[in-house]
Amino acid sequence: MNELPLHLLNMRSLTRDHIEKLIQRANYFLTQGMEKNSVFETLKGHVVANLFFEPSTRTRNSFEIAAKRLGAMVLNPNLKISAISKGETLFDTIKTLEAMGVYFFIVRHSENETPEQIAKQLSSGVVINAGDGNHQHPSQALIDLMTIKQHKPHWNKLCVTIIGDIRHSRVANSLMDGLVTMGVPEIRLVGPSSLLPDKVGNDSIKKFTELKPSLLNSDVIVTLRLQKERHDNSVDIDAFRGSFRLTPEKLYSAKPDAIVMHPGPVNREVEINSDVADNQQSVILQQVRNGVAMRMAVLELFLLRDFRFF
């Protein structure tokens, strides 16, 4: 197994073995921890700082619950009234928090590669990228891979269709990287051409501009919201809704046992119909539940740095 990176900044830094072990450990935390309301002491005495420079409900709260279930102290600085608002640089703030004893820095930022820049400033702490611009969101990809494997355990037989604003989605970037690492043979990207990436970088990834053909024989369908905060208002939402909203009728084109996923937040009746979001094929809430368990596994691994402790 290749050496674990010092920080979790992107999915390409993880090997298939790393991902499989993290899924295995997260499933343990799901069944032996969350379902039994257990609290572990792996992170006892350690401080975790949630540094979210963009709004978040699922990711921030999920990391906080994960850290507390591992016994950590959690710091949620109000960044609007921090020294940053008085002119202190972000990197001086990071060094100050490290001097106070913060070990884990969970970072979400609107600018690409900010977590990487923060990691370069640390003496001994760990940075977990909780989403940077339209670049990467590795913990969400790990959650999605965990959820997929719970329903579809054979990576080499899967067809995964990702629908929506892929060009601006850090979730899509990380998930594509993870699916390629796991050996998924067919990954389909679907949306208007303006919302698809110019290059895909792997032969297993194909682009579609029509929804129904992209759903044929799909095992996994991932819907994504429009990232309106990352581009201008040139996207015609009504046109997008008419062509790319996942409805029960369109879902019939996929395999009967296909699962439907969404990383959230969900914009109902834009990228996904409520009847699909709430039906038996939807695993959206399972993704949320898996989020705490996977983030527990991530925090534990990047502290212990040894799979033998798993």
Curated annotation (Swiss-Prot):
Stored PROSITE patterns: CARBAMOYLTRANSFERASE
Amino acids binding carbamoyl phosphate: R58, T59, R108, H137, Q140, G264, P265
Biological process annotations from GO: 'de novo' pyrimidine nucleobase biosynthetic process; 'de novo' UMP biosynthetic process; amino acid metabolic process
Claim: Cell inner membrane is one of the keywords in the record: no
A Pfam entry, by short name: OTCace
InterPro entries, alphabetized: Asp/Orn_carbamoyltranf_P-bd, Asp/Orn_carbamoylTrfase, Asp/Orn_carbamoylTrfase_sf, Asp_carbamoyltransf, Asp_carbamoyltransf_Asp/Orn-bd
EC number(s) recorded for this UniProt protein: 2.1.3.2
Protein residues bound to L-aspartate: K86, R170, R225
GO molecular function: amino acid binding; aspartate carbamoyltransferase activity
Class of this enzyme: transferase
Protein family according to the UniProt entry: Belongs to the aspartate/ornithine carbamoyltransferase superfamily. ATCase family.
HAMAP family xref list: Asp_carb_tr
Subunit structure: Heterododecamer (2C3:3R2) of six catalytic PyrB chains organized as two trimers (C3), and six regulatory PyrI chains organized as three dimers (R2).
Function: Catalyzes the condensation of carbamoyl phosphate and aspartate to form carbamoyl aspartate and inorganic phosphate, the committed step in the de novo pyrimidine nucleotide biosynthesis pathway.
Protein name: Aspartate carbamoyltransferase catalytic subunit
Higher taxonomy: Bacteria, Pseudomonadati, Pseudomonadota, Gammaproteobacteria, Legionellales
